[in-house]
Amino acid sequence: MTRFSGRPHGSVTAIPSKSAAHRYMICAALAQGRSVIRGLPEELPDDLTATLDCIRALGAAAVFRDDTLEITGINAKPDVLRLDCRDSGATYRLLYPVAPLIGGRAEFMLSPSLSARPMEPVTELLKSKGVAAEKLSVSGSFGPGEFPIRGDVSSQYISGLLLALSLLEGESRIRLTTPLQSKSYVELTRASLSAFGGESQWMGQDTILVKPRRLKAADVTVEGDYTHASLFLAAGAVYGPVTVTGLDPGSIQGDRAMLSILDRMGARVDMGGGSATVSPGRLRGIDVDVSDTPDLAPAIALAALAAEGSTVVKNGGRLRFKECDRISAIATELKRLGADIDEAPDGFTIRGGGKLHGAACLCHNDHRIA
């Protein structure tokens, strides 16, 4: 354990959005011609490396130099695909319905923690379409039609279907059988497909129409990541001021909501010129619905520790099925530091303003907790 002293303040540049990068890389692999993806980190994190390795295994050619990735779309269709997703849920869930449309049989290699996460909504759906679908393998093509699926387990299921259905020769409909959570990630997938010539549209509240479009090469730039920035913004609300540069004020990333959450809590928030600055104010506890922004829960918890009164984080039941049970992990580790926090099935309540102390904490093999 490393102990730091002092009050966090200053300026930091947002890292590139991994959510956008995953989608751009897959779209480029599925597109005709050579695409260019700019603004990536000079050293790819493990989950983006997993996606890069997998699209190469699918038959795409890729060259990475500095912060730019050049991808030439898939032009070979191997009989057997072996896709090592490591611990990347995005890689696995986005590529799972795509893979059988590329090759004869796809075999997935997953980390133990990723293997334990649910995939039944997708495997059962594909089985109903005549595909031999198991958690670690999938084979058999499928055609256009209606694809009913739950919207409250993982938005990545819907994003994977959007990518796959764009490859088919007829129109398809994704019909949500339960309310959609984390809608912004689905919108990010739709926007990524649109950048490569794909087309989809909402038909009411529960159906997405996906039109057949041959994806074309594109030149795109990955924007800054609001999810990663949320921790620095929370630090600014407590200690600050902290400025995060490289953020698009018009971004469709759902986790941009961290700015409005901190504003509601009483922090001073300024956005302009591609940067966000958060300064301390008199923080107060609030209720936060994280059904569309579950990845903000750790950062909200940090700000809540310094707020007067109770902060209630709710509608985040899916947090229990991430890389770890994040609700339990947040509660357990903050209690080690002296926090007054109670778990709920779908969130937690923090009574802030108490005195904290140092402690040895565990990361639970989860980068959001670390």
Task: List where the protein language model places each region.
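Short, structured segments at the rim of ligand-binding sites
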Residues: 1-370
